[in-house]
Amino acid sequence: LLKKYRFFDIGNDNFYFDDYATRAEIERNEREFLKPSLESLLSLVRHHEGQFSFSLTISGFALRLIEDCCPDTLRLLVDLADTGCVEFVGMPYNHSLSSLTDEAEFGRQALKHSQEIERLFDLKPTTFRNTELIYTDNIGAQVYRMGFDTMLVEGAGRSLDVKGPDFVYFNPQQPRLRILPRNESISRMLEDALKDKKLFTPKYFAERLYEVDEYDDVIYLGLNFEYFDTTQYHNNEVLVFVKNLIDKVVDSGVYKFQTPGMAAQEYQPVGPFRAVAPVSGMNRFHDMTPWQGNELQQEALHKVASLQSMVATANREALSEIWERLQCSDYFYYMGTEFFNNPTYGYKPNPYKSPYEAFINYMNILGDLERRLGERIEQDKTDALSDDQIRDIISHYEKEIALLKQKLAN
């Protein structure tokens, strides 16, 4: 979370993030849904003895917060990794939009995230899920070149050729990259069920799964952890719903749970998944509107991307980390106008009163970061001067001052 940063703070305040609020939020998340849901999922994995598998996608920054603030949750994640039934999926380290702005930066962030997964869980991600399922053919091809063999995407109808989302596809530029599209309708039905237990029972939802065409191969259900928020109901009814649903599906024998990597290896691709223009899983149009839909968002994205060369030249880890954190997609989402403060859209609460307030706060911070980068670059230039060069510069200015004094005297 960013702190409130005014124009007059530029040059006077080097701290941009509200670390206290961020820590409070991650601790609240641990209490309300992270720890209870992970405990429940671990119990289900152990109970079903290999018949229940799933994947997790957690940003690198979130993992760092969990490691620093939530040791119990980290232990649960390690225990889940040790079962062999949970796949940790790769992504950009800070949940950024770097795949849309710079190929090298996108690759760097993906590598950094994979290294974090390996460090914490001794697992190397082979499946990739871009921020909010953003995908194009070019992005998919780059993901393959980065070493991933499977990619999760949104099953937007306009991207599929003949068949529906319940199949494995391939990237048209890199046919060895397997593409798994999310079944949007069933995923949203599950999200609705978790938000309101009166809508669907586990039995009803399981029956909808059984109605899927018997010739379909795989149903990719994807949802955000926030939907496991146990404070929505009393007595952890969200987790009871999930447990009953998983039990019914496993016991039926109609379907088997698999990680994305397992499914991609078991089923042959049925065709290419084509997306020349970017598609995402965030809104009903499956486009970039949530982050690039207005001039405020576009200007902010352009500005933060434009600092990349200064960040590289300054070559200071602390400044690089700040710049990386400021690329988080949430900051641009908060500047959205069409869906601002719409509780029916997405799942992210907006801490700002208006898109303009979010924009001004963000741009003030970027302005100060740009100032600091410029100062560091100039300082490095000065530090790099030899003693003779410094003496020459001093001599030059002394002569200039003498000439000015002479003119004033005349």
Identify the residue ranges that each predicted region occupies.
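Active-site and substrate-binding clefts of carbohydrate-active enzymes
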Residues: 1-32, 36, 167, 173-177, ...
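Short, well-structured secondary-structure segments
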Residues: 3-102, 126-129, 149-154, 259
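Well-ordered, non-membrane alpha-helical segments in soluble/globular domains
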Residues: 27-42, 70-75, 107-110, 196-208, ...
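Short, solvent-exposed loop/turn segments at secondary-structure junctions
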Residues: 60-64, 93-96, 133-136, 157-158, ...
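Acidic, His- and aromatic-enriched active-site or binding-groove loops in soluble protein domains
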Residues: 73-90, 123, 144-164, 169-181
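Core alpha/beta catalytic barrel or barrel-like domain that forms the active/cofactor pocket
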Residues: 85-96, 120-131, 179-186, 218-224
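Alpha-helical scaffold elements lining the catalytic groove of polysaccharide deacetylases
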Residues: 96-119, 176-215, 232-235, 281, ...
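Catalytic domains of cell-wall/extracellular-matrix polysaccharide-remodeling enzymes
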Residues: 111-165, 228-242
